[in-house]
Design a protein with these regions (language model features):
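Conserved acidic carboxylate
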Residues: 8
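The feature encodes the CheY-like receiver
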Residues: 14, 56, 65, 74, ...
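Charged docking surfaces used in two-component/phosphorelay signaling
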Residues: 15-23
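Short hydrophobic/Thr-rich beta-strand motif most characteristic of the beta2 strand and flanking loop
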Residues: 25-32, 40
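Hydrophobic residue at a beta-alpha junction
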Residues: 31-32, 55-58, 67, 76
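Active-site residues of response regulator receiver
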Residues: 52, 82
Length: 123
């Protein structure tokens, strides 16, 4: 069973995405801020992380940078899932090592699951 960590501060969205991934056979953990999300990555060792950018305690960009700096975590693919869609934000996310940059408004939860499966099948 593939493991996914969803780091999202909006409880409605995190529950919605979690339910969709569970329905598709994933083991899911959820975190609501960047700091606890980083700790959860280390403990849970997910196959992929879905990461919001606007988060309390540590934003998604800072967290992504910390994940990619850690030897034991840097191979875990991180997908940014956010409403921030400016070109400079997308470029920053990719430059920091994000596998993919998904703008929430452009993707249904089903499409997000399909994209995650596509990424995991490439690895």
């Amino acid at each position: 069973m593939k493991k996914i960590l969803i780091i999202e501060d909006d409880p409605f969205l995190s529950e919605m995405y979690a339910a969709k991934f569970i329905e598709n056979g994933f083991e899911v953990e959820v975190s609501s801020d960047g700091k606890s999300g980083l700790a959860k990555i280390e403990d849970f060792r997910p196959d992929l992380v879905l990461l919001d950018i606007v988060l309390p305690k540590m934003d998604g960009f800072e967290m992504l940078k910390k994940v990619k700096e850690k030897e034991e975590l840097k191979e875990i693919p991180v997908v940014l899932l956010t409403n921030l869609g400016q070109k400079n934000e997308v470029e920053k996310g990719i430059a920091l090592g994000a596998e993919e940059y998904i703008i929430k408004a452009h993707f249904t939860p089903t499409a997000v699951v399909a994209k995650v499966n596509e990424i995991l099948n490439k690895i």
